[in-house]
A protein has these predicted regions:
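Short secondary-structure boundary segments
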Residues: 37, 131, 260-262, 291
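Intrinsically disordered or low-complexity boundary/linker segments at protein termini
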Residues: 1-20, 24, 93-101, 105, ...
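Short, small-residue-enriched loops and turns at beta-alpha junctions
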Residues: 135, 204-209, 236-239, 265
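Structural beta-alpha unit
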Residues: 40-43, 50-53, 69-127, 224-257, ...
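Small/aliphatic-rich secondary-structure junction motif
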Residues: 1-64, 165-234
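Charged helix-capping and loop-helix junction motifs
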Residues: 142, 212-216, 245-248, 271-276
Length: 291
């Protein structure tokens, strides 16, 4: 059950998409949605100013003041976005309701945005993040740090209408622990989907028989949970381009992709594998990830 959903807000327009997605996903589970804004603490702003000074003609003091003003503006915009969301969807359910449905609250704190978001995420069932806007607070490397550090599934929401998220779900399947854990974490969503499509992909020239059979086996296992499932084995190019898998998912009508997040080594876990890096960069579907 997805009872606790964390939505980190950045003060960019795509915050609204993240909140809408959390509402769509959380409403059937009567979820509590926490909108979290981590306002950068003074030392974070000073450090950011020091980094930017190398490429700026402004003095360090001017940069600090500019970054402080921007952070304050982003915090105000994040709160406005949450207030609009709450008024639109949840005002009647602010303290729960006999008819069920989601509830939500705003929380603001001062600190390190990535570290404190990661810490807060450990107390949630799902983290919903908007894909980074240009200059946004959670670019790909920050998403990776949150994903690896929190131990919870992360739903990355692109700039699309989130209204139908999860009605048709595609699974990027590989017979690895990461993919198996992602499927398990996504079971509450999979159980509500109209259709679940299991997709597996091989490098160019590789025999697809074994991987296709693995996908079919997963589809059969999910079908025993009452899900309508199908499986497809895809032949890819030399680099196993995720665009092939994404294209097939969209062709089949998927509006959510479930995938495991793979890293190259346990010693250096912040180095994601090529497929994970590519799918983080290229996926224009809502993306449910677990490391």
């Amino acid at each position: 059950m997805l009872k606790n959903i964390l939505v980190p807000l950045t003060g960019f327009p795509n915050d609204a998409n993240a909140l809408e997605a959390a509402f769509v996903v959380g409403w059937p589970f009567d979820a509590y949605i926490e909108a979290l804004r981590v306002h950068p603490e003074p030392m974070e702003i000073v450090m950011a100013a020091a980094v930017r000074q190398f490429a700026s003609k402004k003095s360090n003091r001017e940069l600090v003041l500019s970054l402080q003003a921007d952070a304050a503006s982003r915090t105000n915009l994040a709160k406005e976005t949450f207030d609009q969301f709450f008024k639109r969807h949840l005002a009647a359910h602010a303290f729960g309701s006999a008819t069920g449905g989601a509830t939500a609250a705003w929380r603001q704190m001062e600190g390190n945005p990535v570290e404190d978001t990661t810490a807060a995420a450990r107390f949630s069932d799902l983290v919903v993040l908007a894909r980074a806007a240009e200059g946004g607070q959670f670019p790909a490397d920050s998403v990776a740090n949150i994903l690896i550090g929190c131990g919870r599934p992360v739903l990355l929401v692109p700039d699309v209408d989130p209204g139908a998220i999860g009605s048709i779900i595609a699974i990027a399947w590989k017979e690895k622990a990461e993919a198996a854990r992602a499927v398990t974490a996504a079971m509450p969503l999979l159980a509500r989907a109209k259709k679940v499509v299991v997709l597996t992909m091989n490098e160019e020239g590789a025999d697809t028989t074994e991987s296709t059979q693995s996908a079919q086996r997963l589809a059969s296992q999910l079908a025993r949970h009452g899900m309508a499932t199908e499986a497809h084995g895809l032949a890819a190019g030399p680099q196993a381009d995720p665009q092939i898998l994404l294209g097939k998912a969209k062709e089949l009508g998927a509006n959510l992709l479930v995938a495991g997040a793979y890293s190259h080594s346990r010693v250096s876990e912040l180095v994601f594998g090529g497929f994970t890096r590519a799918i983080l960069r290229k996926c224009d579907l809502p993306l449910f990830l677990l490391h």
